[in-house]
């Protein structure tokens, strides 16, 4: 069941759900608008000939209040907000419709698991032939929260727990890679 603004407000007030910093206008009827942070990562194409699922990917770290996303390019960003989900709440990130209509696709590659705590890393893709200028602090995506039928037996304890700033892929830390080394 997707949570309403009333439930979201009550959970924040009770301390069950943490979204900080948060302004009242960010809470929508069935979601929370999240803002763009000032931490960005782009893949360093000069240090790698090819990316694999087995090796750490090299990134260029960019800290700034404004960034230009070139045409047909990919960039990692972060939300300004730090979130903490309880063990019975999961979430997913959707790009704002107004921004999607500009050709900027925003996602986070799946669900935000119950028990997750940290800033959310966003994957941005500019599908245009024109660059798009983005400013930190602008509402960029929506966090949709859903209550699970039961509390998770094992809340999220993965490799992105407590992340701050944009965090690159840690696919090289996957279980499959560890098993192949043994």
Swiss-Prot record:
Sequence positions that bind dCTP: 96-101, 113, 121-123, 142, 156, 163
CDD domains, sorted: trimeric_dUTPase (cd07557)
Pathway: Pyrimidine metabolism; dUMP biosynthesis; dUMP from dCTP: step 1/1
Gene Ontology MF, one: dCTP deaminase (dUMP-forming) activity
Keyword Nucleotide-binding included in the entry's annotation: yes
Reaction equations catalysed: dCTP + 2 H2O = dUMP + NH4(+) + diphosphate
Catalytic residue list: 123
EC number from the UniProt entry: 3.5.4.30
Keywords: Hydrolase, Nucleotide metabolism, Nucleotide-binding
GO BP term, example: nucleobase-containing small molecule interconversion
Quaternary structure (record): Homotrimer.
Family as reported in the entry's similarity comment: Belongs to the dCTP deaminase family.
Function: Bifunctional enzyme that catalyzes both the deamination of dCTP to dUTP and the hydrolysis of dUTP to dUMP without releasing the toxic dUTP intermediate.
Protein name as it appears in the record: dCTP deaminase, dUMP-forming
Organism: Halothermothrix orenii (strain H 168 / OCM 544 / DSM 9562)
């Amino acid at each position: 069941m997707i949570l309403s603004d009333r439930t979201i407000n009550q959970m924040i007030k009770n301390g069950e759900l943490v979204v900080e910093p948060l302004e009242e206008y960010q809470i929508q009827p069935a979601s929370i608008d999240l803002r763009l942070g000032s931490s960005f990562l782009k893949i360093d194409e000069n240090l790698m000939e090819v990316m694999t699922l087995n090796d750490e990917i090299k990134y260029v770290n960019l800290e700034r209040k404004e960034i230009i996303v070139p045409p047909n390019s990919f960039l990692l960003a972060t939300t300004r907000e730090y979130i903490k989900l309880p063990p019975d709440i999961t979430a997913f990130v959707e790009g704002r419709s107004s921004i999607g209509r500009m050709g900027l696709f925003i996602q986070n590659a799946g669900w935000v698991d119950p028990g997750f705590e940290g800033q959310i890393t966003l994957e941005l893709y500019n599908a245009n032939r024109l660059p798009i200028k983005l400013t930190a602090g602008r509402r960029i995506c929506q966090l949709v929260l859903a209550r699970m039928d039961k509390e998770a037996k094992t809340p999220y304890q993965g490799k992105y727990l407590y992340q701050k700033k944009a965090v690159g892929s840690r696919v090289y830390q996957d279980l499959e890679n560890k098993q192949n080394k043994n």
